[in-house]
A protein has these predicted regions:
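Single conserved hydrophobic/aromatic residue that forms the stacking wall/gate
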Residues: 1-8, 12
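Short alpha-helical donor nucleotide-sugar binding micro-motif in glycosyltransferases
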Residues: 161-162, 169-174, 189
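Short hydrophobic beta-strand element within catalytic cores of glycosyltransferases
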Residues: 200-203
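Conserved acidic donor-binding segment of nucleotide-sugar-dependent glycosyltransferases
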Residues: 215-228, 236-242
Length: 278
């Protein structure tokens, strides 16, 4: 995203949300334009490091302003009536441990690869719900067909895209929130959202998510693409009692609130523009 400061008309900013490979000609052209930019904003330390290497930029020219999470919204208690409504609306079985995989359904988000792992768990006490945008119909059908081929229809389902309130309630009802994308994400806010709600999580420890996992023990982190670690860690995380986890989750929640809040993000942008306009 490009921005031009109205307060300082000669100041140009460029905001990076993620890093993708591209055509070398366009990369060269883009790099030429970046050299003229006064200030570059990256939404995570991962993005900062990647664009610094990819475009051969001075890292001092890149400021990290973490993507913001609506802390107050996710802290707000959920009414019992909302919980009951979601259970009925999506036919949620609360008698089992729910693994929630919140991400739009597309190849690089890694749902099919995780389904392969879930199929090997052979544990009837776990359910798996995929929540996310289903506009990629071919991938959604591929995932649904694989669920059926594994005969997992009774343990796994695609819920699809959810309204914000519904997703928050599903976080609340879930035992573990997961994230295993095939590529590192620029930020990956579902992890911060889950941690604000003091939920157990398990995620690949790379990209923008890595900073969000900073205050958590290694049991909640998986090295990228180390699928053999996932089953063991899921089973161990479930065994952690509420009292032990409450201390871990409180520290992590405080860290997320102070570092990745929407308020902090907005204030950082305001400060940046004010500095440039002096």
């Amino acid at each position: 995203t490009h921005h031009r400061s109205s307060a300082a008309s000669d100041v140009y900013k460029r905001q990076f949300h993620n890093v993708y490979s591209g055509n070398s000609y366009f990369k060269k052209l883009y790099n030429t334009q970046l050299s003229k930019v006064d200030q570059i904003v990256a939404i995570s330390n991962y993005v900062k490091n990647e664009i610094s290497k990819k475009y051969n930029l001075d890292s001092n020219k890149i400021k990290v302003i973490n993507r913001g999470v609506d802390v107050k919204y996710f802290e707000k208690p959920i009414l019992d009536s909302q919980i009951e409504n979601i259970i009925n609306k999506y036919q949620i079985d609360t008698s089992k441990n729910i693994i929630l995989y919140p991400a739009r359904l597309t190849n690089w988000k890694g749902q099919i690869e995780f389904l392969d792992i879930f199929n090997k768990m052979q544990n009837d006490n776990f359910l798996l719900y995929f929540a996310g945008d289903t506009k990629n119909q071919s991938y959604t059908e591929k995932l649904q067909n694989k669920i059926q081929s594994f005969n997992l229809g009774h343990k796994c389902k695609i819920i699809g895209n959810l309204p914000r309130d519904d997703l928050k309630t599903l976080y609340y009802l879930s035992s573990i929130i997961t994230s295993f994308p095939l590529q590192a994400e620029g930020f990956g806010r579902t992890i911060s959202e889950a941690l604000i709600m003091k939920k157990k999580i398990l995620a690949f420890n790379y990209g923008g998510v890595k900073d969000q996992l900073d205050k958590l023990d290694d049991i909640y982190k998986v090295d990228p693409h180390k699928y053999n670690e996932i089953v063991i860690k899921l089973q161990n995380i479930i065994k952690i009692d509420k009292e032990k986890f409450s201390n871990i989750s409180l520290d992590s929640k405080d860290y997320i609130s102070k570092t990745f809040s929407k308020y902090q993000m907005v204030q950082s942008y305001v400060d940046l523009y004010e500095q440039q306009s002096i």
